[in-house]
Amino acid sequence: MLRLPLKNGTVENYKLVGTPLTPQTPSISFNRIAFAAAHVVASPLFEVDPWQLSGALDWNETLKYRRYLWDQGLNVAEAMDTAQRGMGLDWETAKELIERTVNEARHHPLKPRVVCGAGTDQFGIEDFKNEDQIINAYSEQMETIEKIGGQCVILASRAMMIVSRGPESFLRVYNRLIEQAEKPVILHWLGAMFDPALRGYWGTESISEAVSYTHLTLPTR
């Protein structure tokens, strides 16, 4: 039963009708690998200072939602900037989220894949003065993810926009990260439409040039 507000300021009871859809595992194999950037479920029972950027999550409901996605044959992209990190989930909470999700996936009958966002958000943007500091920050998160058992998704970093000297800076940083990774990585970048501070990422505002840099120059694993 839902209680819906009306235009006249009153509330009306509304009863849902019909048969809810039941999640079903696909009967045939996907010809693509599909990852769901799953959201988290906030707990209304914990008092949290939003200015401290620490999340209060309902872990039971958060993991239940992931099982719901896995039951339908989807994989999960965890701790992503688009789903959680860009909305304020700090690295410490993201790290716990990654660990819980990876462990939960191990016990799921479909053995779903979990890829996890690695960024530089354990530090403030003002802390970065050079490319090596960015590499070290990325490496710290990547090593944590790999130790837990996840596969890394390299998230775009605002810090690169501060210290970058052009395309060569991006190629140097990303080459290092890809070469040292234990498994193939996924590059994740949505550009200015997601975050205006990322305008000109890869050292250019041209999509075709950015694609040529990443496709032709970065190593493949």
PLM region spans:
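N-terminal amphipathic alpha-helix/helix-capping segment at the start of soluble metabolic enzymes
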Residues: M1-A38, T62
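Conserved small/polar residues in nucleotide/adenosyl-binding loops
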Residues: T214-T220
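Active-site glycine-rich loop that binds ribose-phosphate moieties when present
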Residues: T204-Y213
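Hydrophobic transmembrane signal anchors and adjacent membrane-proximal interface regions, especially
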Residues: L4-L6, M160, H215
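Active-site beta->alpha loop and helix N-cap motifs at the rims of alpha/beta catalytic domains
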Residues: R32-E205
